From Swiss-Prot:
It comes from Human immunodeficiency virus type 1 group M subtype F1 (isolate VI850) (HIV-1). During virus replication, may deplete host UNG protein, and incude G2-M cell cycle arrest. Acts by targeting specific host proteins for degradation by the 26S proteasome, through association with the cellular CUL4A-DDB1 E3 ligase complex by direct interaction with host VPRPB/DCAF-1. Cell cycle arrest reportedly occurs within hours of infection and is not blocked by antiviral agents, suggesting that it is initiated by the VPR carried into the virion. Additionally, VPR induces apoptosis in a cell cycle dependent manner suggesting that these two effects are mechanistically linked. It is found in: Virion; Host nucleus; Host extracellular space. Phosphorylated on several residues by host. These phosphorylations regulate VPR activity for the nuclear import of the HIV-1 pre-integration complex. This is Protein Vpr. Residues 1-42 are annotated as: Homooligomerization. Belongs to the HIV-1 VPR protein family. One of its GO terms (cellular component) is host cell. Gene3D superfamilies: 6.10.210.10, VpR/VpX protein, C-terminal domain (1.20.5.90).
Length: 96
């Protein structure tokens, strides 16, 4: 007969504490890369859509993660992560 696994180390922190910590980190990073009025509008949209619920917290975490990922991938000016724009040769001299 199957048995539940025994104690396997320290307890993980509760999901809601983890989610709030992640949200705080994402907010701190987002204000360094996006205009505050724009982020405020996003927060208002999430609040109007989800109210003050955990579903809203999850939604804003997901959206901020996606926005920051795309922002870094396109190439943030004050980050070394991202696509480095290549210079284009006008006359095509470097083509093989």
């Amino acid at each position: 007969m199957e048995q539940a696994p025994g104690d396997q180390g320290p307890q993980r922190e509760p999901y809601n504490e983890w989610a709030l910590e992640i949200l705080e980190e994402l907010k701190n990073e987002a204000v360094r890369h996006f205009p505050r009025p724009w982020l405020h509008g996003l927060g208002q949209h999430i609040y109007n859509t989800y109210g003050d619920t955990w579903e809203g917290v999850e939604a804003i975490i997901r959206i901020l993660q996606q926005l920051l990922f795309i922002h870094f991938r396109i190439g943030c000016r004050h980050s070394r992560i991202g696509i480095v724009p290549q210079r284009r040769v006008r006359n095509g001299a470097s083509r093989s």
